[in-house]
Amino acid sequence: GSGSDYFRDQSNGVFNLTFDVAGPVMMPENYAYYGSNIPYDDANVRTMLTTALNAIDADTDFSRYDWNGDGEVEQVFFIYAGLGEANGGDENTVWPHKSIISNQGVTLDGMTVNTYACSAECQPIYQGGYVVDTHIDGIGTICHEFSHCLGLPDMYDTDYAGSGGEGYGMGAWDLMSSGSYNGNGFHPACYTGAERMWIGW
């Protein structure tokens, strides 16, 4: 199914989300410029996103995405080419995440665009422990990152040190833990009951 199918199912029909697709946009710089690591972030990922937003502005009416009339687009979702650093990409690729562009955001069509989430286009094919090829990613990471826009936290060991991070979660049984990778991302886990309650579903 699609991301729309996932959210419709998890909300018992309450949340009927549709995605409008714009692009693709060719970036003027290479992966390393945008994705090289700095402490707790990628170097110029927000420059990448702002460049993409400006490139699609002429063909996109951003006012359509202000769902509550507050002058701000609720969120935008970016899918960037290639692998992500969380799954097969090297340190020069972008880590899938949810964040804001800046303290002020970007103004397009009179709307502030600020909250965003992003994930990679592809996932790796491994052979002998090495990435030998890629194929299209499933919906799992998209659903996981978009769920942060809905207010859900990560439910896995976010410092990867066995400390529990924000929480050990339920592993493959929970989208917000490692369940986004089930079936190569094509069969992501459901939300837990607590997560549905958190969102109001």
Language-model region placement:
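Extracellular hydrolytic enzyme modules, especially secreted metalloproteases
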Residues: 75, 81-201
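Active-site-proximal segments of metallohydrolase catalytic domains
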Residues: 1-111
